[in-house]
A protein has these predicted regions:
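Short, surface-exposed ligand- or partner-binding patches at beta-edge/loop junctions that are enriched
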Residues: 64
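Rhodanese-like catalytic fold shared by cysteine-dependent sulfurtransferases
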Residues: 1-22, 28-60, 69-108
Length: 108
């Protein structure tokens, strides 16, 4: 199974270009409380099986976590469920922060 991946520089480029995609932070509530990528929606990993009908079919779904490991597995799970437009953010929010890109606080 081939998991599609992009790096943080590519994600930043797509954000700046206004590309049409959805970005999900699949970390825990406690992790997300410390910051989230701009424009991301929080969807805790354990809830993914219950949200299958919510994933768009017509645009890329980019998933990330802390390091890219959990989101890689989540992308694999989605592929197994027949959702082929899931993309993993390699390196996760750690790589994003190391590159000096902005992190937002979660809107209350």
């Amino acid at each position: 199974m081939m998991i599609q991946e992009i790096d943080v520089a590519e994600l930043k480029r797509r954000m700046d270009a206004g590309d049409d995609f959805v970005l999900y932070d699949i970390r825990s509530d406690g992790e997300v409380a410390q910051g989230i990528l701009p424009g991301a929606e929080h969807l805790a990993m354990h809830l993914i099986p219950f949200k299958m009908q919510d994933f768009p079919k017509d645009k890329e779904i980019i998933l990330y976590c802390r390091s890219g490991a959990r989101s890689y597995h989540a992308c694999a799970y989605l592929q197994q469920q027949g959702i082929s437009n899931a993309v993993n953010l390699r390196g996760g929010i750690i790589s994003w922060a190391q590159n000096g890109f902005d992190i937002s606080s979660l809107a209350a």
